[in-house]
């Protein structure tokens, strides 16, 4: 395989999985990434041809996207890797029937409306019928969607912070989307702990990195202020992935808070792995995916209520010396990105 074209709806660098595919494939073959230009700060990765397609113009933008894909896939030996592109994935397949092509599914629908979830998951399953080769993030997701003959392409992680952590305080970090995640429950749980703790025990801090739908971040900031957490909870908004290291360096506990719902249950959370690879124990909600990786040696599993968040913080602070950054990193070595992309490269080379 000499050339792979990766197609995704996200602007380059803002979808973690495809970013690391590019990073670790570029030393083995030519890599082209095609995605929307969403007006975010550009992420630069040497050795990658990035084509950012303008989203202006309604139907015209779709034609621009199709034109970019057509131009980059003229060689029938170019492998096309599509991170599921809602409503268009099937058309990409029809455009280039002779090219080896993979449909990669990272998630089912996480819409709050059951009707919309059913609709979008049905569309996904119909589009998947056009593909011979399909990769999925987890076996649970493949089973949930009723997909057969899929190849597992699990979530990976890279060490963002190599520093060994000191656990004299609890400097918690949540990184991820705020959309549909009920982060207000996390804030209420922190407030409950703060209200119960003795004055001398209030060595807790929480940084929330990410954004959601319009007005959502401001709403969470207001909730934190109402709870008297102005000196404890900090909101940074969105931070590009390649600028996260200083934040990870200064925190020692990761928060993987995902509501306990059927549509999130089999969704492996990116940040759980990144916290662990950075030597941070994790307070994680008890999803099926988190239960596969979180143990008493690298974190604590909780429910998704404020009381459970409070309990998780208490548990984390009771015996902080039981955690070792090196042991925590060792617990998830199988999920390192280089290993995962090695397997992906072998898979892509054998496509027909």
Regions found by a protein language model. Name each.
Residues 304, 318-351:
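A charged, aromatic-enriched C-terminal amphipathic alpha-helix characteristic of glycosyltransferases
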Residues 296-307, 315-321:
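Conserved acidic donor-binding segment of nucleotide-sugar-dependent glycosyltransferases
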Residues 12, 181, 242-244, 254-274, ...:
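Nucleotide-sugar-dependent
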Residues 23, 66-70, 90, 103, ...:
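Membrane-proximal helix-turn-helix segments that form the acceptor-binding/catalytic region
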Residues 5-7, 135, 163-190, 207:
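Conserved donor-binding/catalytic core segment of Leloir-type glycosyltransferases
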């Amino acid at each position: 395989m000499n050339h792979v074209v990766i197609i995704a709806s996200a602007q380059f660098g803002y979808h973690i999985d495809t970013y690391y595919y590019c990073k670790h494939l570029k030393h083995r073959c030519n890599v082209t990434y095609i995605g929307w230009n969403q007006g975010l700060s550009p992420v630069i990765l040497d050795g990658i041809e990035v084509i950012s397609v303008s989203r202006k113009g309604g139907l015209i933008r779709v034609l621009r996207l199709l034109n970019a894909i057509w131009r980059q896939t003229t060689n029938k030996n170019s492998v096309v890797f599509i991170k599921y592109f809602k409503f268009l994935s099937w058309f990409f397949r029809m455009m280039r029937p002779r090219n080896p092509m993979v449909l990669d599914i990272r998630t089912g629908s996480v819409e709050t409306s059951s009707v919309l979830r059913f609709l979008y998951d049905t569309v996904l399953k119909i589009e998947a019928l056009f593909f011979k080769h399909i990769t999925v993030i987890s076996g649970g997701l493949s089973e949930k969607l009723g997909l057969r003959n899929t190849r597992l392409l699990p979530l990976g992680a890279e060490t963002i912070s190599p520093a060994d952590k000191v656990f004299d305080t609890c400097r918690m970090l949540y990184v991820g989307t705020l959309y549909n995640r009920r982060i207000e429950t996390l804030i209420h749980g922190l407030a409950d702990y703060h209200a119960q703790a003795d004055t001398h025990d209030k060595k807790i801090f929480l940084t929330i990195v990410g954004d959601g739908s319009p007005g959502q971040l401001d709403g969470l900031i207001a909730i934190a202020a109402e709870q008297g957490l102005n000196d404890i909870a900090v909101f940074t908004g969105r931070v590009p992935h390649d600028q996260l290291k200083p934040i990870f360096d200064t925190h020692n506990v990761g928060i993987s808070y995902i509501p306990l719902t059927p549509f999130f249950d089999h969704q492996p959370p990116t940040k759980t792995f990144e916290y662990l690879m950075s030597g941070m124990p994790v307070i994680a909600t008890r999803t099926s995916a988190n239960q596969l990786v979180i143990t008493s040696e690298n974190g604590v599993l909780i429910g998704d209520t404020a009381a459970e968040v409070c309990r998780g913080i208490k548990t984390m602070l009771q015996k902080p010396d039981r955690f070792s950054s090196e042991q925590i990193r060792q617990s998830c070595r199988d999920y390192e990105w280089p290993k995962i992309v090695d397997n992906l490269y072998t898979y892509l080379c054998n496509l027909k």
